[in-house]
Amino acid sequence: MKHKMHVQPSTVTLAALLILSCPTCYAADRASWYGENQRGLPMANGQRFNPDKLTAASWFFDFGTMVVVTHANRSVVVEITDRGPTKRLVNEGRKIDLSRAAFAKLADLDFGLIDVTVRKQ
């Protein structure tokens, strides 16, 4: 006798929420970079932005959190120091903006936007 497994929509929703709320889990995202035009400007954490440091802006991690960002078998560890990208871009699938130095460790700056995975270190 074969048994069919019936999954309730609420079960799927709960599973998705658990995965998304897991602070050490990873998520597929899009990333961009910001650089010279923000040099020296205050970030959301109160410090001044330096595009030469390995930092990132995100709404999804606390300030000071170290995250591993991976693209095409290359990874970089960055500290969350700012908030961004803008809410409109977050709604379009962009979850993190990298400093110029961090982005350059993953891809040529000319790409501008890359697919990444992000996980808490």
Pin down the residues of each PLM region.
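Secreted/periplasmic proteins
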Residues: K2-L18, P23-Q121
